[in-house]
Amino acid sequence: MVSCTEFIPMYSELFKYIDDKGGGHDAVVRYWEWVGEEYLRWNLEPLVREKGIEGAWEYWTRSLSEEACDVKMVFDPENGQMMSHMRHCPSKGHLLEYTWMEPYYDYCGHCAVLYKKTLNDNGISQAGDYSGVDHAECRAVKYLTGNGKPMEGWDEI
């Protein structure tokens, strides 16, 4: 069995391998899309199909807790939105600490791509601020597509 501390650099190295040997960044994105469809059909997809944005909230509160993330999350069920500020992503944090490898340059890109189709197919849009990924930080909002834009200040939590 591979531990999570071993999986993280292996995942990053796989992205680099696909990028180098399999057709560049577009091939990596196709891989992320495939993983998203295959993996999320068993956990996120049933939750958002049945519960909408509340199912997304349930999924992320559980998964981010399991990952022991330093994250602040806000749920606004009245406006159909959930916001998160990942103050320190443990996965990217580990990669930044390693001196023996260089992380895949778009490692954090997998988060936006993995979930996009499942969310969109169930009426949920997402936006993200990935300007802080070089120090393991990002912000994201997920919102009901029919509600237009994410609420003001989502990128400031």
Regions found by a protein language model. Give the residues of each.
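N-terminal accessory segment detector
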Residues: 1-109, 117-139, 143-157
